[in-house]
């Protein structure tokens, strides 16, 4: 029986690649050895070259073929730089001019890659992540030795200039934002000290529960003038100050005075945590813990009248032994229980009983500026705080219990209606 034989296949001809392709593959292989990111940058430069060539051909026509109706002609090349891999990379930019030579014709691909806004944003993000200008280049992705040799834009001074430009834009955008479309139910105002200066910042809570950084102002202290200027600026930018609004503050008299000067119907909620600290700081440690427990129990009481009665009783108990603590407890006592009188449910009250939300935003600003060793001037303080507020906004979530905010709006309107005569009543 004859054995089955496999058919003999003809020899496959050796694939011979053009020299141009072989050189390109060798360059890509070299970049691949330096890492995938370096390969991506090398590929990006190659793709950019093809895009530029395609733009030129679309405007001028194929090289060597005369087009009588063409409106532009090739005009050689010129050294230029594009943004790739967090750097400014040198490439040769083809030039195209009108047939009469009077004007340069822009190439869409070049217009897309040439701007430096991306580098400004990268500098802002990395600096706010506490990467110093000295270590900036070490934090960039690898782009390959060949690209690195000619790349620019990573020096300490260049990064610093870009960061300043980016933070100036962040400050300008924050202070110029249109607020007319915001439907605020609550507002928080607090101060932050940076070096020898004080910045007052404002955070709004909208009807749908979003937290919105509103603005900031700089001064020597947290005084009524600085706060009033900040709030008046919000009003000038379109914020409605005629509707009732819950304003949460830490109890500083300057804040309260400025709020009542600018807003027509503010309903003040003093931060319960600040009140607790102010009282217990005036007590010996053995007594402070007991007083703190009684204050927390009263603050969380379902009945605001009973809560106020308990706190007034506690103040009387402290009158003889610790009069300073008793006076601190009585000062603005009713305003620490505002959310209870408004019937705010516990889930939403957790957010509105204190200034924790705005203090968390301030803490993020401080964290981002941790590497700053020398504050040159007030403008530098404003730039850093504004940039930090912008970064904090990216981390914001809707407040707990936001579904109860429409009910809070109704309660605020009802509260004001009971103390403010209507136009019809005044006429009568």
Question: For each of these PLM feature ranges, what is it?
Answer:
Residues 129-142:
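Short, charged amphipathic recognition helices of the HTH superfamily
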Residues 264-281:
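Inter-helix linker motif
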Residues 118-130:
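Short, amphipathic alpha-helical "recognition" segments used to contact nucleic acids or chromatin
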Residues 2-110:
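Short, conserved DNA-binding cores of transcription-related domains
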Residues 91, 279-309, 313-316:
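Metal-dependent DNA phosphodiester-chemistry modules and their immediately adjacent helices/loops
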Residues 2-4, 65, 72-77, 82-99, ...:
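RNase H-like nuclease fold core
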Residues 52, 136, 186-192, 211, ...:
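Short, conserved catalytic/metal-binding motifs centered on acidic residues
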Residues 1-12, 19-31, 43, 49, ...:
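Acidic/histidine-rich catalytic cores and adjacent linkers
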